[in-house]
Amino acid sequence: MAAPVASLNPALAGIDSLFSAFPSSSSLPLGVAYSGGADSTALLLAAAERWPGQVQAFHIHHGLQAAADDFVRVCESVCAKAGLPLHIVQVDARHASGESPEDAARRARYAALATAATARGMQGVLLGQHADDQVETMLLALSRGAGLPGLSAMPASFGRGGMVFYRPLLHIPSAVLREWLVEQPIEFVDDPTNTDERYTRNRIRARLLPALAQAFPQFHATFARSARHAAQAQAVLVEVAAQDLAVVGNPPAIKALQALSPPRQANVLRHWLLLQYATPSAAQLEQLLHQVAACTTRGHRIHLKVASGHVTRLGGSLCYSDAAARAC
């Protein structure tokens, strides 16, 4: 990694912390997901300062807002002044009936970033999510009754579509990044949808975060610590599930499942279903546990809806099949 460069940009601290374990030869060149907002602007300029000539900006144009073209103009202006390559990637983020618009846009964005960055030889993509985003994600998970995966919030790095994504700003509050940009001054845009309180995340941002800051000034650090604890505990559960799956078999043998405690049954069944690209709801998993417990005779049948498919009984084992050509 390059030697530290003197700079007041707080995003550099996050970059240095995340990338201290990576030799530059394995992580460069890098793309930055650049929306034109304050957070990604600070991240882009910090990355360009840390690795001159090794950073390119990627702007995803969803076409979902009237202001989208204004975002592009700001991105072009900032990148031109900084001498950075900018790639505008058009995506179709329309959502299907019954699908969350936010989820559809997020999936389209990551897929487009992975494809565009790979095509230009990037070894990774930096994302601008910060400490406030991490707290919002945890509070959203709590509001939905999430388990450890949800409470783990956002990981610092992950793979998708053959590309590695990094989040170096997860320990830096948004206000710190914004203050630095204003002091320079450096141009950025505010997404008007971020103040639309029809969205739960925006209500959390507008109402809960200010209250938390007043009552618990260190909440960014304490929430981040809780997320790390949850992630560590989840990692242990995944290890135990893999060990149990090796014992009960894949597909799982019903008698072997019944020999496990109910919590371990739930853990290994969730793990098995995730391997089939099926995410069971809490209610579906509870129903499946009841059915496994009731399998005391050969004639007991199981046919439960899980995600887009069904769990059935096939002889002495469970089987998952769905419309995506996975069949028992």
Swiss-Prot record:
Disulfide partners: none
Coiled-coil ranges per UniProt: none
GO cellular component: cytoplasm
Enzymatic reactions: cytidine(34) in tRNA(Ile2) + L-lysine + ATP = lysidine(34) in tRNA(Ile2) + AMP + diphosphate + H(+)
CDD domains in the cross-refs: TilS_N
Residues annotated to bind ATP: 35-40
GO terms for biological process, alphabetical: tRNA modification
SUPFAM superfamilies noted in UniProt: Adenine nucleotide alpha hydrolases-like (SSF52402), MesJ substrate recognition domain-like (SSF82829)
Transmembrane segments: none
Record-listed E.C. numbers: 6.3.4.19
Main location per the UniProt record: cytoplasm
HAMAP family to which the protein is assigned, alphabetical: tRNA_Ile_lys_synt (MF_01161)
The record's note on its domains: The N-terminal region contains the highly conserved SGGXDS motif, predicted to be a P-loop motif involved in ATP binding.
Family per similarity comment: Belongs to the tRNA(Ile)-lysidine synthase family.
Identification of the protein by name: tRNA(Ile)-lysidine synthase
Species in which this protein is naturally found: Polaromonas naphthalenivorans (strain CJ2)
